[in-house]
Amino acid sequence: MNKKTQALIEQYSKSLVEVAIEHKIVEKIQQEVAALIDIFETSELEGVLSSLAVSHDEKQHFVKTLQTSCSTYLVNFLEVIVQNEREALLYPILKSVDQELIKVNGQYPIQITTAVALSPEQKERLFDIAKTKLALPNGQLVEHIDPSIVGGFVVNANNKVIDASVRNQLHQFKMKLK
């Protein structure tokens, strides 16, 4: 993706985020955008909208079908994208909007990687520790299981890492022995 396209994506997403903040509908827009992203990820819609073989009218029809379950502000946003013939960029724009709204809400995904599945109590405890240590007001827990870490856990959130895995401890011990 070139710089011009990336700048367009950022400008469109910034515009929708500003509207959501201004009208105090951040959560509603975030839910609607997440639903649209799910549609893109479970269908061939991105390929259809970026295809040169599909006419502008057909693309417009596909986008209009997306608008049926959207708020007025998101409908207007989608109409602007269609008017400016930016349908091919709709999916990356929606992904960018989603990331920006996560930042606005402070709801960063908190990824916890362990060697084995955690109990609900352990998840809650690690989640609380992660929020405290990484200074996050709130977030969404995303659990990953990776047997290669041997034991312990690794927490990733907002570009910060807490690595309390046995694999990391063994690596640090190995480096000290050198």
Curated annotation (Swiss-Prot):
Keyword Nucleus tagged: no
Record's signal peptide: none
Cellular compartments annotated: Cell membrane
Membrane topology category: Peripheral membrane protein
Keyword Nucleotide-binding in record: no
Chief localisation class: membrane
GO molecular function per UniProt: proton-transporting ATP synthase activity, rotational mechanism
InterPro entries, per the entry: ATP_synth_OSCP/delta_N_sf, ATPase_OSCP/dsu
Gene3D superfamilies according to UniProt: N-terminal domain of the delta subunit of the F1F0-ATP synthase
Keywords assigned by UniProt, alphabetized: ATP synthesis, Cell membrane, CF(1), Hydrogen ion transport, Ion transport, Membrane, Transport
Entry GO terms, CC: plasma membrane; proton-transporting ATP synthase complex
PANTHER family per record: ATP SYNTHASE DELTA CHAIN (PTHR11910)
HAMAP family: ATP_synth_delta_bact
Family: Belongs to the ATPase delta chain family.
Biological role: F(1)F(0) ATP synthase produces ATP from ADP in the presence of a proton or sodium gradient. F-type ATPases consist of two structural domains, F(1) containing the extramembraneous catalytic core and F(0) containing the membrane proton channel, linked together by a central stalk and a peripheral stalk. During catalysis, ATP synthesis in the catalytic domain of F(1) is coupled via a rotary mechanism of the central stalk subunits to proton translocation. This protein is part of the stalk that links CF(0) to CF(1). It either transmits conformational changes from CF(0) to CF(1) or is implicated in proton conduction.
Subunit structure: F-type ATPases have 2 components, F(1) - the catalytic core - and F(0) - the membrane proton channel. F(1) has five subunits: alpha(3), beta(3), gamma(1), delta(1), epsilon(1). F(0) has three main subunits: a(1), b(2) and c(10-14). The alpha and beta chains form an alternating ring which encloses part of the gamma chain. F(1) is attached to F(0) by a central stalk formed by the gamma and epsilon chains, while a peripheral stalk is formed by the delta and b chains.
Name by which UniProt lists this protein: ATP synthase subunit delta
Natural source organism: Streptococcus agalactiae serotype V (strain ATCC BAA-611 / 2603 V/R)
Lineage: Bacteria, Bacillati, Bacillota, Bacilli, Lactobacillales
Primary gene name: atpH
